[in-house]
């Protein structure tokens, strides 16, 4: 039989139609496991940003690449870009500075204190959902304007660093002196899994409790906003109600009232809002919803030119000052000079205009030389005048311009660097010398560290102190596991576990902690007294070493001789270097590694375990082996016995996995304790073990069970010990940015 042929062009057309045009194969929606079993524990957060996803490869080290960068040359190129207006997206007032300030602000401004997520690190503004949020309309163009510079310097500067640096250069190019800049933001290669809210529609708001308070960890009032609705809460133009929301949302970004005022007043000194037309009639789909031909650009405007004087962004329209590309005091001056009355933008959005007709021509048009306008304010601007606390600050800044300028410079620096962690991570020649309390300062190493012989001797002293293996392990874990990789805060360095507020956290069992720390401090003091040559050891090092030698002892008890790596060089922070309120948000409401769970937790015990493991940058196998090992070591908070599936606690055995997988045990919910399970012998009915959901999930969840079987096998003990030590060492050194 003669076979029919399809012309090449037709075949290509057919292939493209199959790929994009609605074929059954392409369009069929796959029903995933989460649909069938919505309560199934999701392990995907522990598989984010795997090294295999990084096109630069595992040998690429961003810090080294950045150090080879000619930062001055980059800044020179960025400065030149400010006034190189492009026909496809012309600059307002011939200067892109305000546009780039908004880009940098919105990149960093999604940071939130409760879980440390968001912020400029990772360059997440490039990815969904942030690249398509309503509050980020047209910032896709800002990043495209920057592409030639990113293209030129390639791997030497990340998108995260470039966006923040561009914001800094924008300010400087308009006459403002910034506080400094630090590089070091490593780019991500996929969208971070973040709970931005449960709403199903943009600008919806279903994130408040019965008291009207925003749920944690949310940082914004509505889905798709960075902070607040500039028109007022849910679009209601009430300045005092707006002030309340501003205070809450900026506080959730770690800003106090003065920093909040400085940021708003300083930022709104520059640029303008864009609302030339009704967005519903003019603006197309966001980038994520646009076709492939749009090449990642969205919000195509079909009205007028589609840009310039026809630009539509927020729907609000106008500028705050007469010279929007220069640093002036006009924002604050005009806020108090004029009485402001409500009006509407051409797009129909509520804003404010001076009651005085003499203000009608104070502001030049951004594109039309023969056209002028009155200044405008948002409801969120009027809030700075109406709220008594904000009013005191704004009037003080108005009378003291230099104070205002410094406050804005410092607040901008904090905004753009808050998620970077300690100053030890900062890179570049523009890092400011001043140490700031929000950087969680730790004294610089100022003495020779102990050598291997000293470490061995100190370890023996710790073991001879009378402290048990579980006590030493619990203390070291409590100290180191306070780290969260989302914003690089916490950790063992600094020994803040002995300070407020960490010393009184319920998960840390304050009474036992005080006893252990007292003995370790005595060991430290006595040992330092015996050292020569100026050598010293910090309490932070002693705490970690105590846990490490306890693990070695426990492994030996299990018949495995090991050496747990230990690198000295940690220092001890002081209470004066520790902002109690700032550190309070790090307190764990749950820690599945210690089988600790409080009713203040936002999710189930197993889900909170995944959250804690994610904070510690752990993989699924690392999380699994740590839970099993810590149970065997008896490291549960307050010494509770749930999940300690061994008759020899304090020994680093794989008993947790062996006994969890033992089919001679039948599990059932306890009738006496809510949230507890009882494991009984199938034949005798005798109670063998008690457990929490965190313990049992390693046998019930198919993927976790698969890993547990590796460690519960007859040949699993040695692998278990070695893997536990690697994972333990990873946590102990999570905040060692100096090694």
Curated annotation (Swiss-Prot):
It catalyses: H2O2 + AH2 = A + 2 H2O; 2 H2O2 = O2 + 2 H2O. There is a cross-link at residues 105-227 (Tryptophyl-tyrosyl-methioninium (Trp-Tyr) (with M-253)). Its EC number is 1.11.1.21. InterPro entries: Catalase_peroxidase, Haem_peroxidase, Haem_peroxidase_sf, Peroxidases_AS, Peroxidases_heam-ligand_BS. The record marks 102 as: Transition state stabilizer. Heme b binds at residue 268. The active site is at 106 (proton acceptor). Keywords: Heme, Hydrogen peroxide, Iron, Metal-binding, Oxidoreductase, Peroxidase, Signal. SUPFAM superfamilies: Heme-dependent peroxidases. Formation of the three residue Trp-Tyr-Met cross-link is important for the catalase, but not the peroxidase activity of the enzyme. Its cofactor is heme b. One of its GO terms (biological process) is hydrogen peroxide catabolic process. NCBIfam families: cat_per_HPI, PRK15061.1. PANTHER family: CATALASE-PEROXIDASE, HYDROPEROXIDASE I, BIFUNCTIONAL CATALASE-PEROXIDASE. Bifunctional enzyme with both catalase and broad-spectrum peroxidase activity. This is Catalase-peroxidase 2. It comes from Shewanella sp. (strain MR-7).
């Amino acid at each position: 039989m003669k076979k029919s042929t399809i012309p090449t062009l037709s075949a290509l057309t057919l292939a493209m139609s199959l790929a994009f045009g609605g074929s059954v194969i392409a369009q069929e929606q796959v029903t995933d496991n989460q649909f069938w079993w919505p309560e199934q524990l999701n392990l995907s957060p522990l598989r984010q940003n795997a090294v295999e996803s990084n096109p630069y490869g595992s040998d690429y080290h961003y810090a080294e690449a950045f150090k080879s960068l000619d930062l001055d040359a980059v800044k020179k190129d960025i400065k030149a870009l400010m006034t190189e207006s492009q026909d496809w997206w012309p600059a307002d007032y011939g200067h892109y500075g305000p546009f780039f300030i908004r880009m940098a602000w919105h990149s960093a401004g999604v940071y939130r204190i409760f879980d440390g997520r968001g912020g400029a690190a990772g360059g997440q503004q490039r990815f969904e959902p942030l690249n398509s949020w309503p509050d980020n309309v047209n910032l896709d163009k800002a990043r495209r304007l920057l592409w030639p510079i990113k293209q030129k310097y390639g791997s030497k500067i990340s998108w995260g660093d470039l966006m923040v640096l561009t914001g800094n250069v924008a300010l400087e190019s308009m006459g403002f002196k910034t506080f400094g800049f630090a590089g070091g933001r490593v780019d991500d290669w996929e969208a971070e899994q973040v709970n931005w809210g449960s709403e199903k529609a943009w600008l919806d708001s279903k994130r408040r409790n019965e008291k009207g308070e925003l749920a944690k960890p949310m940082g914004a009032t509505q889905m798709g906003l960075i902070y607040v609705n500039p028109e007022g809460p849910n679009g209601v133009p009430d300045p005092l109600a707006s002030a309340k929301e501003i205070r809450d949302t900026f506080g959730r970004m770690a800003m106090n009232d003065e920093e909040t005022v400085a940021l708003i007043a300083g930022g709104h000194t520059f640029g303008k809002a864009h609302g030339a037309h009704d967005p519903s009639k003019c603006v197309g789909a966001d980038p994520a919803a646009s076709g492939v031909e749009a090449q990642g650009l969205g919000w195509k405007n079909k009205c007028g030119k589609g840009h310039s004087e026809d630009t539509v962004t927020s729907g609000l329209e106008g500028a705050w000052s007469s010279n929007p590309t220069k640093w002036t005091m006009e924002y604050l001056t005009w806020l108090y000079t004029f009485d402001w009355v409500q009006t509407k933008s051409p797009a129909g959005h509520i804003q404010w205009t001076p009651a005085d007709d003499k203000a009608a021509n104070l502001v030049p048009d951004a594109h039309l030389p023969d056209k002028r306008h009155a200044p405008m304010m948002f409801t969120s601007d009027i809030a700075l005048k109406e709220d008594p606390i904000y009013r005191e600050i704004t009037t003080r800044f108005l009378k003291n311009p230099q104070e205002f300028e410094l406050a804005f410079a410092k607040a901008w620096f904090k905004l753009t660097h808050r998620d970077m962690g300690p100053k030890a991570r900062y890179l570049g020649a523009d890092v400011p010398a001043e140490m700031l309390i929000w950087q969680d300062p730790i004294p610089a190493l100022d003495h020779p560290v102990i050598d291997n012989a000293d470490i061995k001797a100190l370890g023996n002293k710790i073991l001879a102190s009378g402290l048990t293996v579980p006590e030493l392990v619990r203390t070291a874990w409590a100290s180191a596991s306070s780290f969260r990789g989302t914003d690089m805060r916490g950790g063992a360095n600094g020994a803040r576990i002995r300070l407020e507020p960490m010393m009184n956290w319920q998960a840390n069992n304050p009474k036992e902690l005080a006893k252990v720390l007292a003995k370790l401090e005595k060991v430290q003091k006595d040992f330092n007294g015996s050292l020569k040559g100026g050598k010293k050891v910090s309490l932070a090092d002693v705490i970690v070493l105590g846990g490490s030698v306890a693990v070695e002892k426990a492994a030996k008890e299990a018949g495995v001789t090991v050496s747990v790596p230990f690198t000295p060089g940690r220092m001890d922070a002081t209470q004066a270097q520790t902002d109690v309120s700032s550190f309070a948000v790090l307190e764990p409401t749950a820690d599945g590694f210690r089988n600790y769970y409080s009713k203040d937790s936002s999710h189930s015990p197993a889900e909170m375990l995944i959250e804690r493991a994610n904070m510690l940058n752990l993989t699924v196998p690392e999380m699994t082996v740590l839970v099993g090992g810590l149970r065997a070591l008896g490291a549960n908070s307050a010494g509770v016995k749930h999940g300690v599936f061994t008759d020899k606690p304090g020994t680093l055995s794989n008993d947790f996995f062996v006994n969890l997988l033992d089919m001679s045990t039948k599990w059932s919910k306890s009738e006496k304790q809510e949230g507890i399970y009882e494991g009984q012998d199938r034949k005798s009915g005798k109670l063998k073990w008690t457990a929490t959901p965190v313990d049992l999930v390693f046998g019930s969840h198919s993927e976790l069970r698969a890993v547990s079987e590796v460690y519960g096998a007859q040949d699993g003990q040695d692998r278990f010990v070695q893997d536990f030590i690697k994972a333990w060492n990873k946590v102990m050194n999570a905040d060692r940015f100096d090694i």
